[in-house]
Amino acid sequence: MQFIDQARIMVYAGRGGDGIVAFRREKYVPAGGPSGGDGGRGGNVIFEADSNLQTLLDFKYKRIFYAEDGNRGGPNRCSGVSGSNLVIKVPCGTEVRHLGSGILLGDLTEPSQQLMIAFGGRGGLGNAHYLSNRNRVPEKFTLGREGEEWPLQLELKLLAEVGIIGLPNAGKSTLIGNLSAAKPKIADYPFTTLIPNLGAVYRPNGDSIIFADIPGLILGAANGAGLGYDFLRHIERTRLLVHLIDSSAKDLVHDLIVVEGELIAYGHGLADRPRIVVLSKIELLSGEELHQFSQALRMVSGCKILVISSAILSSIEFLKTQIWQQLGT
């Protein structure tokens, strides 16, 4: 499935139905009074979070949405039928913003959560409303009002509690595959991960936590370089970041600084998020090199440095333990 996490759409609530002019027509009542009914209200536009959806792909093919118009009024003071509401399903984690101003209108994070986004127009009044002592045969009625219309920006931010970050080829996809049952694409070239990978990892109490592996960050990612910037929004909701560093890289400290700098440049509090720094692929290092590199990274990051090998199960389990401790579980 193609992963689409942004969409621009236009929504139109329904127009209210018109009121009508009508008079009572009954036998032996030659001068029946006004009986024109009111128009029905236009349908509203409502967003609803759906846990079965994972992407905004549907909005690539349909971008304009209309709720149903209200029906015109009827004789005998009968009101027109209101237009049906239009319910638009979106994935959990979708933010809805006004396209022009960027103002956040709603954040749909829970299954079945709804957001009323555009109200239908009021129905017009029938001539029955305009009967008075001075006007016993009113011909006046009003038209239904137009419904609200909004240009909208939809943004999907994945609901993951732990984000795995690092430069391209740091081993993030391998790690999330070992931590969970996720099966990400893995190969020895940059940007193997072209979309965020999600994996559910089970805690000791049996509950699961969602991990997200986003495409690798490079220098300038916060300004649009590479692939990372488009997906940094997906770790905005995380409680913890796992920063993975490839021990076979030429300059580990430089790699650490690059990613830390991009978190600062991106903003949204990512640089202040609790994190664990992990040195991966340690099977390639001697004991002395491992100690040296760990010390250097600790001095720059101020964090405890964990060392793991994806080939050694015990190191993966140790990392899980550290993550649970950080999350308070």
UniProtKB/Swiss-Prot annotation:
Pfam families to which the protein is assigned, alphabetical: GTP1_OBG, MMR_HSR1
Residues the entry annotates as binding Mg(2+): S173, T193
Signal peptide: none
CDD domains: Obg
A GO molecular-function annotation: GTP binding
OBG-type G domain boundaries: 160-328
InterPro entries per UniProt: G_OBG (IPR031167), GTP-bd (IPR006073), GTP-bd_Obg/CgtA (IPR014100), GTP1_OBG_dom (IPR006169), GTP1_OBG_dom_sf (IPR036726), OBG_GTPase (IPR045086), P-loop_NTPase (IPR027417)
Main subcellular localisation: plastid
Residue spans crossing the bilayer: none
Names of required cofactors: Mg(2+)
Gene3D superfamilies: GTP1/OBG domain (2.70.210.12), P-loop containing nucleotide triphosphate hydrolases (3.40.50.300)
EC number(s) recorded for this UniProt protein: 3.6.5.-
Localisation per UniProt entry: Plastid, Organellar chromatophore
Keyword annotations from UniProtKB, A to Z: GTP-binding, Hydrolase, Magnesium, Metal-binding, Nucleotide-binding, Organellar chromatophore, Plastid
Record: residues binding GTP: 166-173, 191-195, 213-216, 280-283, 309-311
Complex and partners: Monomer.
Family: Belongs to the TRAFAC class OBG-HflX-like GTPase superfamily. OBG GTPase family.
Function as written in the Swiss-Prot or TrEMBL entry: An essential GTPase which binds GTP, GDP and possibly (p)ppGpp with moderate affinity, with high nucleotide exchange rates and a fairly low GTP hydrolysis rate.
Name of the protein in its database record: Putative GTPase Obg
Organism the protein comes from: Paulinella chromatophora
